[in-house]
């Protein structure tokens, strides 16, 4: 997965595959509208295990997103986290990007992180307890 260079090429006016907007010109939406297309929710990791079949070191995660249910994610976060440290953690997930099969495992949500100075992924998370499935805005 590579981050978008900018979301201004999306428009909410027409739906593409998986319910995502089709590409459009930059004048079609404001930066705020582009941000609002992403459905970012808070979840809690219920289970984490090494993803042995993945080409890059990864974990299989099962994330409870409250009313959205439990969703799976394949996450390349092995440098800073052990599976046992992930269970019970709150995480932020993009839930409307569509599912993708990663080495036989269906990844339904993208768990969000940011690279540290060494390029290792640091998870994004609220600093207090919040309702599972809560929308990030």
PLM segments and residue spans:
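Phosphate-backbone binding interfaces of nucleic-acid-interacting proteins
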Residues: 3-137
């Amino acid at each position: 997965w590579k981050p978008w260079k900018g979301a201004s090429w999306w428009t909410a006016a027409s739906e593409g595959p998986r319910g995502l907007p089709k590409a459009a010109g930059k004048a079609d939406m404001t930066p705020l509208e582009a941000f609002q297309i992403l459905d970012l929710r808070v979840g809690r990791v219920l289970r984490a295990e090494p993803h042995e079949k993945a080409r890059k070191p990864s974990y299989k995660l099962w994330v409870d997103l409250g009313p959205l249910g439990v969703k799976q994610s394949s996450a390349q976060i092995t440098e800073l986290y052990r599976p046992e440290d992930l269970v019970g953690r709150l995480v932020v997930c993009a839930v409307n990007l569509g599912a993708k099969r990663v080495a036989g495992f269906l990844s339904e949500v993208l768990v969000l992180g940011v690279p540290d100075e060494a390029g290792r992924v640091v998870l994004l998370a609220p600093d207090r307890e919040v309702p599972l499935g809560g929308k990030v805005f």
